[in-house]
Amino acid sequence: MTSSSGSLKLEIHTDDKTPGKWSVPLGDDVFRRFLSGGGGSEKAVFGEGSLFSPFLFGKYFDPSDAFPLWEFEAEVLLASLRSLGQCRVDWSQTDQAYVLKSDIPVVGKNNVQVYVDINGRVMEISGQWNSNKKAATNSDWRSGRWWEHGYVRRLELPSDADAKYSEAFLSNNDDYSFLEIRIPKINSKNKF
């Protein structure tokens, strides 16, 4: 996982009123059938070590459910993936900020978006990887079987995270994009 110069600063959205977004849960058995029947794109997006893999944290966890990431040490949760060389994500915190870094496979449109629900204290990272498969008419792809069209990882924000000053950057190479998100702490003197 490497960062390169020439990063694109992503807009962090705060007003997303998509009805029914992430309302269809991705169950363990559904995910296993989906992944076993899929091709290389599905495995690149949802495979071992990916930020969007339901098995990223050692056991199954639906990525559309908010996870309290910063309550855990990356070294502990990712130890087995790191020992196998399959880890493409990392997170940490300093006195000033919370930081998330992740490789994101370049598949399909790869339109990574970051949303923050300031009141609900949740950050979500999502994007559409399969624009060829049509969602139901008059429906947003995130409102149905979202995993057939895109990906998501929802994260609970710590109580001292100042989400309104968050920054996200994306840099690209041939096979992966590198995403870095920085969320300052409320009492930090250094807002980005």
Curated annotation (Swiss-Prot):
Domain of life: Eukaryota
One Pfam family it belongs to: HSP20
All residue ranges annotated as the sHSP domain in the record: 80-192
Gene3D superfamilies membership: 2.60.40.790
Protein keywords: Cytoplasm, Stress response
InterPro entries (UniProt xref): A-crystallin/Hsp20_dom, HSP20-like_chaperone
Keyword Cytoplasm belongs to the record: yes
SUPFAM superfamilies hit by this protein: HSP20-like chaperones
Compartments, as annotated in UniProt: Cytoplasm
Recorded GO CC terms: cytoplasm
Assembly notes: May form oligomeric structures.
PANTHER family membership: 21.7 KDA CLASS VI HEAT SHOCK PROTEIN
Similarity comment: family membership: Belongs to the small heat shock protein (HSP20) family.
Protein name: 21.7 kDa class VI heat shock protein
Native source organism of the sequence: Arabidopsis thaliana (Mouse-ear cress)
